[in-house]
Amino acid sequence: MANVALIGATGMVGSHILTSLLENPAVARVDTISRRTPSAAAAAPQTQLTTFVSDDTSRWAAQLSSLTPTPSIFISAFGTTRAAAGGFENQYKVEHGLNVEMARAARDAGTKVYVLISSGGANKASSFAYPRMKGEIEEDVKALGFERTVILRPGLISGQRQESRPAEAAFRFIAGIAGKVHSGLKDGWAQDADVIARAAVNAGLKALDGDVPPGSEKLWILGGSDIIKYGGKK
């Protein structure tokens, strides 16, 4: 049975990850750390889910370090937007800084498996700021040396966000129409949030058991087709 810590539990993918974790019989306990109380917390028993809620993110790493038992898996679906952060410089400080800080705290606490929701375009050498930031997060957490690191690189994420992102919403609408015509028209470039979430949970549990593809013993990267494969309903 796995103990799992999760940040980003109130976001579009993270909320589905939390639901998937709570429904999975292989997960004994879930600890979330967030700015707001996750919606799933109201129905979950305290023996299964513990939430730590604080706007002061400087307290998050200490909270993660204090968890007992130590999480065997740490999942990050944490992210923010340029608009919410007040510009890209602040977005980078929050998203890159907190992701790496929390990953380091998990590693130091003895967590074995780290799972990151990244982006399909992540590339530390990109000339564009957002994919470069995502690539730098990947590189910095890989350097921490977890027993196993799992990185998911979804394309466009389909689903309903709480915050407004007009351009992205237009593409999500197109993805929804394409998916209704035939799933193959969408799966290569867009994945549903709940599918990404199940893939993250299933891949994390498989990594904990050592059940990973050959050559992925230390680092397992899942692209769009892998996310569809591991995120399908059984």
UniProtKB/Swiss-Prot annotation:
UniProt-listed Pfam families: Epimerase (PF01370)
Localization annotation: Mitochondrion outer membrane
Name the record gives this protein = Protein fmp52-1, mitochondrial
Keywords assigned by UniProt, alphabetized: Membrane, Mitochondrion, Mitochondrion outer membrane, Transit peptide
Q: What is its main location?
A: mitochondrion
Cross-referenced InterPro entries: Epimerase_deHydtase, NAD(P)-bd_dom_sf
UniProt family annotation: Belongs to the FMP52 family.
Topological category with respect to the lipid bilayer: Peripheral membrane protein
Is-annotated flag, keyword Transit peptide? yes
Q: Which cysteines are joined by disulfide bonds?
A: none
